[in-house]
Design a protein with these regions (language model features):
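S-adenosylmethionine/decaboxylated-SAM
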Residues: 2-212
Length: 212
């Protein structure tokens, strides 16, 4: 469970990822948009391993070219190779499937059936337009009872992008879990808002319903 600490990158969604590990069933599918060098991916897979859920497939989607100002001063040229090294064991076991592409690539979107994904993690391009597109494109892929989460909701671009993407599906609220940088979550369930209030694992981290 500690190998992720040796991997460079930004990762503050431990509680979000542990909720996914807790509720996903063995054999289901997870999609992670934006993985950088694999710090968060390593944490997720090690958590699934610890939980005995060895048949979960995790699809990671990343251009490995970075996006926006958050990567402006980072040398990303070796990032793909570093990711592959950091996750080699899980890749060899075919528990991680790597898609080197944009998250709005139509062929990738078409490869996932509607209502087929247990969890979608959005942590790619943080511009409002990109977040809106990711939320809008990937929400239909989330199965009933599944969850969509995204990082850095403290950024107005992420918050507004999330609202706008869900609004296009007729959804007017989202759970905001307040931590160091904050993350959003939406569960596909008739009692989504009530269930969202339970997304709290770390003492001092509170969740609340926000309306777009």
């Amino acid at each position: 469970m500690y190998k992720y600490l040796d991997i460079p990158g930004w990762f503050n969604m431990h509680d979000a990822y542990m909720n996914i590990v807790k509720y996903v069933d063995d054999g289901q599918t997870i999609v992670e948009i934006g993985c950088f060098a694999g710090r968060s991916t390593r944490f997720l897979l090690d958590g699934l391993d610890y939980a005995g859920k060895h048949k979960v497939k995790v699809h990671v989607i990343d251009t490995f070219e970075g996006s926006g100002m958050e990567h402006a001063k980072v040398n990303l040229s070796p990032m793909y190779d570093e990711f592959m090294r950091n996750l080699d064991d899980y890749i060899q076991d075919e528990r991680i499937i790597v898609h080197v592409n944009r998250s709005d690539n139509q062929n990738i979107l078409d490869s996932f059936a509607t209502n087929s994904v247990a969890a979608v993690i959005i942590d790619g391009d943080h511009t409002m337009e990109a977040v809106e597109k990711d939320v809008y494109n990937w929400w239909p892929k989330v199965m009933e009872g599944g969850i969509m989460v995204g990082d850095d909701v403290r950024l107005d671009s992420v918050k507004q992008g999330c609202y706008k993407g869900l609004a296009k599906h007729g959804i007017d609220s989202v759970t905001h879990v307040r931590g160091e940088e904050g993350w959003f979550a939406k569960i596909k369930h008739p009692d989504a808002d009530k269930l969202g209030e339970q997304l709290k694992l770390i003492p001092g981290v509170n969740s609340m319903k926000l309306n777009g």
